[in-house]
Amino acid sequence: MKKYRDLLGLVHYLNQSIEQGKTIGQKKLIKIGDLLKPYIDSYNDKREWILLSNASVDENKNLIVDENNAYKYTAEGAHKRDKELMDLFLSDFDYTPIQINSPSELDQYTFLYGWVNGVEFTIEPEEEVEL
């Protein structure tokens, strides 16, 4: 089990690390990102459902949208939407770690720890800092 908040953090780190995809490691990160896509799509589908379910409608049940075509919300709808979005963000989902058969150049990307199998990560202990 993983949490969606951790998945979104992983996606952030992947995007920051991929850059132009110039190295073998960066190309492998792109492939890992592709394998994570079904989990990301599931989160986005659930998120969109929450946004839609709490949007304001007029007397004819038509969605009320702003000039940017974004949903509008009543104060109550916005509060309910925000609570449901936070619940989703903190919720668990079933996750099977990605098996890596050729781990070269991935050991430096320690943010993958727990998300992939087959990589020996080089995790250096943090230095203690006196305050």
What label would you give each PLM region?
Residues M1-L131:
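A composition-driven surface/loop motif
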